[in-house]
Each structure stands twice: as structure tokens, then as C-alpha cells.
Amino acid sequence: MRVGVLGVQGSVKEHMDKLKLIKGIEAVEAKDKDTLLTLDALIIPGGESTAIGKILVDFGLKDAILKLNERKVPIWGTCAGMILMAKHIVNDERRHLGIMDITVRRNAYGSQINSFKTRLIIPAISENEIEAVFIRAPYIESVGDGVRILAKYEGKIVAAQQDNLLATAFHPELTDDLSFYRYFLRLNS
């Protein structure tokens, strides 16, 4: 399976390193639309959503990602990636990809200094607690029909799935746990 990490900004290397640990995965850093269109799955990493959103438009990557979604290719957005996927952003008038029926709040847990780690129990993902790293993290304020809430932290939605789309407010790539990767890759079957 050919799995790409959108390689324009953010935690690209960390996602690539995790994918390389999974047997049968060809990890690809996707920096152009031609590469994007060859993928069996795509991860949109954390970073700065406004900067990534601008790059998506300026380099024609947005249309390629929208085509992947039309083909029901699994797409996973972590942190900023989740913001980019959201149909609505509460504290920002921009709409980037708008492919997932969620409403998110950017920097919901505060600034960089308010970043934190915690452990979450997410039965759909793992029988064990999962470490979750939140860095200037968003959260999901509401979900539309057909969106499955996977995890909450202090009453706020921090992980969700809608068909082929997965979104996490936190950074699984910064932990040793591959559970979210394995779950994501099963969306392709």
C-alpha cells in the first residue's frame, strides 16, 4: 500500500518514520499533485493550518486531495490537518479542504506553552490507553451526521471518523504507539 504524507510543512518526517515501521507500507512524501494522485492513503500532518492551506491552493494540491476524497481514498488529518479537513472553523473565516463534516476550534487549548500530553482510552483504536500529545491543539466543537466520535478529552471531541476520513486533534506521530496508524490503514480495506 502506497501511503503519502503531505510534505509541505509540519511533522512530515515523524509520520514517515512511523509508516516505515509498518510492514507492507510504501511511505511517500507527497509534495506535488502527480504524486498525490498515485496514493492509496494520505496523511495531512500537523503544522500551521493557514500556511499549509495557502500552499495547497498555490501549488494545485487542494484539487488533487479533493480528487482523492472523491475516490474514497483514506485521508487522515492530525492537528492542523484536521483543521484543513473541517467544513467549518469557529474562530477563522477560512475554509480549506472542507471535506469532513466537523466544526473545529483552532488553538482551542491555548498557545504553545499550553501544550500537553495525556493518555486516552479509545476502544475503537486500542484495548490499551493511548498517549496523546496536544500542541496548540484544536478540538472538534460539533460533528455532522455520519461522523463517528472516536475520542473525547475533558468533554471535547479530539478524534473522529467519517467514512474514509480520520481526524485527530493530537499527534500520534510523536508517540511510540502505532494503533492509530493501523486503524487508519484499515480504512482502505
Curated annotation (Swiss-Prot):
Report whether rRNA processing shows up as a keyword of the record.
no
* Catalytic residues identified in the record: 79, 171, 173
Which protein, by its recorded name, is this? Pyridoxal 5'-phosphate synthase subunit PdxT
Q: What is the species of this protein?
A: Caldanaerobacter subterraneus subsp. tengcongensis (strain DSM 15242 / JCM 11007 / NBRC 100824 / MB4) (Thermoanaerobacter tengcongensis)
Keyword Lyase included in the entry's annotation: yes
Listed A to Z, the keywords are:
Glutamine amidotransferase, Hydrolase, Lyase, Pyridoxal phosphate
Mention any Pfam family matching this sequence. Answer: SNO
A single Gene Ontology CC annotation of this entry is: cytosol
Catalysed reaction per UniProt? aldehydo-D-ribose 5-phosphate + D-glyceraldehyde 3-phosphate + L-glutamine = pyridoxal 5'-phosphate + L-glutamate + phosphate + 3 H2O + H(+); L-glutamine + H2O = L-glutamate + NH4(+)
Q: Where does L-glutamine bind?
A: 47-49, 106, 135-136
Assembly information from the UniProt record: In the presence of PdxS, forms a dodecamer of heterodimers. Only shows activity in the heterodimer.
Q: Which NCBIfam families match?
A: PLP_synth_Pdx2
State the similarity comment. Answer: Belongs to the glutaminase PdxT/SNO family.
Q: What EC number(s) does its UniProt record assign?
A: 4.3.3.6, 3.5.1.2
What role is this protein assigned?
Catalyzes the hydrolysis of glutamine to glutamate and ammonia as part of the biosynthesis of pyridoxal 5'-phosphate. The resulting ammonia molecule is channeled to the active site of PdxS.
GO MF terms, alphabetically ordered: glutaminase activity; pyridoxal 5'-phosphate synthase (glutamine hydrolysing) activity
User: HAMAP family from the xrefs?
Assistant: PdxT
Q: Name one process (GO BP) from the record.
A: pyridoxine metabolic process
Q: Part of which pathway?
A: Cofactor biosynthesis; pyridoxal 5'-phosphate biosynthesis
